[in-house]
């Protein structure tokens, strides 16, 4: 058995068929992390803008965080249908690195993502951008309203689906996001592989409006920030 939480590193335990613990195979003393000012993430809940649902987010604060001070925020996103990014498990060392540079690191599960049942997951069918943009904006505004986030220093980053997420934030949500790093993105899902796309979007000829709404290219006229796009060869 293997398990962890946001405040406990992973433990690997050998159990018998009845579930009785026999031996701890591997564990990490969290004091080794605390020696480097490890900051434990917090899982938060906030309302969607339309008030229809409570959403889950996870926040990693800088080690020297002081309530009442506003900090730059890096939003790490993915957002593809059926995926999940907010977990009660041991956290990312990359997020820790960013937090130690003075950033608040924020991630959330928008409507259409996983972990909340089939009906929640299916809300993004046919338009992957609709709730991803709205719900992420609600999360960022929640951090602004509670006095944590500097509204003039909000950035996004992600890889693959997260690269798409970043492009969407810098365009459709350009009123909130200033900078972004988009790695290996899909900017228009008409140009991506059909076996992945069509199970969430339907056929392009049957859902032109949904593909248009999902495409980052539909919102490039709103772009006013700085975006670094990275990809392989």
Annotate each predicted stretch with a short phrase.
Residues 1-233:
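Serine-hydrolase catalytic core recognition
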